Amino acid sequence: MKKKIFTSAKLLLMGVILSYYLVFTACSALTLEFEERDLTITNLDGKIIPIRVELARSIREMSKGYMGRENIPEGTGMLFIFKRDEKLSFWMKDTPTPLSIAFINSSGEIRETRDMTPFSHQSVDSSEPVRYALEVPQGWFEK
């Protein structure tokens, strides 16, 4: 009888530990913090435009992106940094804010910009291999 109670207590303790682990992992995914940097973009007229960006380097950071964010302040963005030039593909799953994306080559030159629709599962692809992608509030590149 004592052995059965001991085994049940061990199982209960393992269940409690597993529950705490699952809750902690879920919460840490929600509270992912991105490193921030100040960058500048030089437009075609030679005007220098400052922007504060969050850096997305890891798969986890890239997967999270702006998902769930309802407010992205003007003058800010998220810079996705890839290890090599490749054709990139983005979507807006669980992203409620309209965004524009710039596809940027390894020399830092913006090759193209595209607008993206909130919550869309349709992919937005770069037309050529690039190293970076910069997401900003929709319309920011036109200003």
Where do the PLM segments sit?
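Compact, glycine-rich, soluble single-domain proteins
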Residues: 29-143
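Bacterial N-terminal signal peptides that target proteins for export
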Residues: 2-13
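Hydrophobic helical h-region of N-terminal Sec-dependent signal peptides
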Residues: 13-22
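C-terminal motif of bacterial Sec signal peptides marking the signal peptidase cleavage site
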Residues: 25-26
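Short secondary-structure boundary segments
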Residues: 4-6, 19, 46-47, 51
